Design a protein with these regions (language model features):
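Generic domain-boundary/flexible-linker signal
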Residues: 31-32, 120, 151
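Short HxH-centered metal-ligating active-site micro-motif
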Residues: 83-138, 144-147
Length: 235
């Protein structure tokens, strides 16, 4: 039996991009340490999430840079003046549960999306997005090796429409990845490709599905009343 664990972090319920301009990475992303992440398509970056206050951003970014290289998820929350909402919370390799107090009205909630070499940390899972929609915190972030994903509500936020949109996007994500993984598994079992090529192909397929999901989230901003971006890392 072939099994490679490419769990979508936050998928079990993470409670609930650095740089200014946009730009994109096409086909691969080269990290500051020289390692490469391969995918099909275009990973699109945006500007800074303007919803965050200067005070909140200073505290949030310092915490994200401190924790982004950890191998398990951590969560943290601050108010608009930069005051922390309780202590950070340590999770596991695929999720982190944080207290409801983290989701206070106007708060910014952030957590870490770690993943292994050759893999994108990835955008928000359906669980992340459901928590964002159902709680009063204004902004939710996920810091990954490729940057910081950030989503904020506007005064036109459509909770139910957004949740339906996210559900459809994640169904497409799952079906797209699973179809490619099944094809690769068939090729491996038949001897058409070796195990190393199978692993590399699965990683690329997963990254590709994550890029597609990210770009889909970006496309729904105006219709459902939210701001979404991937901020480039400055370090």
């Amino acid at each position: 039996m072939i099994k490679i664990n490419l769990q979508f972090f936050g998928g079990r319920g993470a409670s609930s991009s650095g740089g200014g301009g946009g730009g994109s990475a096409k086909g691969e992303l080269v990290l500051p340490n020289g390692s490469k992440i391969e995918f099909e398509g275009e990973l699109k970056y945006g500007g800074k999430d303007a919803t965050l206050t200067k005070e909140a951003r200073k505290v949030i970014e310092a915490w994200e840079e401190k924790r982004v290289k950890n191998k398990v998820e951590y969560a943290y929350s601050v108010m608009e003046d930069g005051t922390p909402v309780g202590a950070e919370v340590r999770g596991g390799t695929g999720s982190v549960r944080s207290p409801r107090s983290y989701k206070q009205d106007g708060a910014t909630f952030t957590h870490i999306h770690p993943r292994g070499d050759g893999m994108l940390g990835g955008t928000f899972s359906k669980a992340d997005m459901d928590n964002f929609a159902n709680n009063p915190a204004k902004t939710t972030r996920a810091k990954a090796k490729e940057g910081a994903y950030s989503i904020s509500k506007t005064d036109k936020f459509d909770t139910q429409g957004f949740k339906s949109f996210v559900s459809g996007a994640n169904s497409k994500f799952n079906s797209s990845y699973k179809a490619k993984e099944k094809s690769l598994a068939t090729d491996y079992k038949s001897g058409k490709i070796g195990y190393d090529d199978y692993k590399k192909g699965v990683a690329k397929a997963f990254n590709t599905a994550l890029v597609e999901l990210h770009n889909t989230y970006s496309s729904g901003q105006k219709q459902y009343g939210y701001k979404y971006t991937l901020e480039k890392s400055e370090k």
